[in-house]
Amino acid sequence: MEERYLQLLAREYPNRQAALCEIANLTAMSSLPKGTEYFFSDLHGEYKGFSELMNGASGVIREKIRIQFQDVLTNPQQNQLANLIYDPVKVLSLMHEYGRDTNEWLKNTIFYLTQLCRGVSAKYSRVHVRSKIPHEYDYLMEELLYPGQDEGRLEYGSSIIEAVVSSGLADTFIPQFCKLIRSLTMDWIHIIGDIFDRGPRPDRIMEELIEYGDVDIQWGNHDISWMGAACGNRVLIANVVRMGISYNNFDCLEDGYGINLRPLSDFASEVYHDDLCECFLPKVLDENVYDKVAKSLSAKMHKAMAVIQLKLIGQMVHRHPEYHMEDRNLLEHIDYEKGLYKYNGITCPLTDTNFPTVDPKNPLELTQKEAQLMDVLAASFAHSEALQRHVRFLYSSGSMYLCMNGNLLFHGCIPMNEDGSFERVEVDGEKYAGRALLDRLERAAREAYFLPKDHPDKQKNVDKMWLLWCSAQSPLFGKSRMSAFERYFTKEKALHEEVYNSYYRLSADPHVCDQILKEFGVDPVHGHIINGHVPVRQKDGENPVKADGNLYVIDGGLSKAYQAKTGIAGYTLIFNSHYLALAQHHDYISHPLSKPESDEMPTLQITQKMDKRILVSDTDAGKKLSQRMDELRLLVKAYENGSIVERAIGSYPKTIQSLHMETMEIVR
């Protein structure tokens, strides 16, 4: 096997010199500082807010400007440069509006951008920087970034800037330079769950993540709901449509994903024509741009989907008694004559008793029109090219959890018992706990999407996606129940209560964090748990850093729906070669950029300084580089002892540089 592998490697590095050259390249790469990782959580469709955080690298760009130019630029000038990098088109427009975009200002701006870009690119190889430079300006930008020390070369750089401005290229050159700085500032992005629901455009967030590329995702329960809908789970199709309507997210459903809601609109208008559906009025946090729907009609559509979903949930509960979720089968616990809900010793009146499509003798049966409506919706989800492409990206870049560079990332919880032991959860007749549970559930989620339609295990795994969405034993949910439907139809507070899994209390204990980190093979001395799911009530004094610094909970309320609870507009955790830091964000969307020097920067707090600067060799990528170098050394020995014959580099079409870039993609 080793000889066969070396023969394959020899196709890429056809002689001893080529292999040694790559070993030298990778050795140099290993000695560079690690790139900066950014951790975001619970984006919930807030595309504009997320874009602001991405464009500003969560305040890191502003801090780099302060360090590099504090003796050169005034504070307003530093703000102006930062805002230009965040939103170059907007700032250039404002400068033009104020008559301040003189040639001198443009030349100075390009000069400062060049200086800053040299600073942020210093930790990367030229190959990496070159791969990020926009193609149309690759020659000009590379010449500016690597001028050399010769006086003539310095004058050459000035002449390039002069030529860019005098030829009228500045308005396109500057935005591309800003984009390069932004991309070099953020080496890797972690999304710790819940891209979808509540906010207006999760589809646009997905497009931005796909374009960025260097990203991983730890699935949240709201993500798994959309993934399940894309798999054909009808409970979850009803769920995402219901939730989308409840938050007035018609633009996402219809414009973003092309979901045909006209049959639902017609059905709801007919069935609930004389019902005000007051319990189902949508929460309007954002107005629709492309698909404006009257609140009265939205409420009817909302109720129609809620009732259909309740029927489908009841059917799911009957199909899978092993889920132990009988408390979700609400429609079979209603006394329709008296208008009462009865379950588990609790009897309470319903706030809404108009169920024109429910047969009290067979409450879980869909009417013919409801069944036809679900057929239309299922077809829309199955044939939505954008949705299916986004879900494939969620699968290819996502997982239930991730261990990377000494950190353990997951969205919700590791189910635990009160005594601190890992909860044993039954899946297909076998019990799993801890890491094994998450591995088993991830396998089920992948099989739900990728197994052929006629595979005998396909449907049971598709059904499990609902379990992952809202089961008390789901690591993505981690509450006793999801009481959304009790909130629709009852005022009984006891029925509204959702009790968190013991993990959420126990994980504040450093010893419990150590136990969890060890379970996942992460060093508890230097490792951290990073998760979201539960909004941190910062306004009430809650700290996102828990368990003596072992646990970071970074759901700070980027979602507008939670900002009243948290008091802020989200957190970003930043992990660079020097420290861990938390950026605390303000509501940038309510305070749009009005002048170039506006100061709407996040609060940056360093939470942990590293004992020594972290190098690439200290990271997971560094371990892969080391492994690659070991393989190349074996290849060199094979060339030296003659077991593999050397060839000229010209025998192969690929250059050493292109092979080096491929190697870097492998280790990333």
Describe the residue ranges of each PLM region.
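Feature recognizes metal-dependent phosphohydrolase scaffolds
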Residues: M1-R668
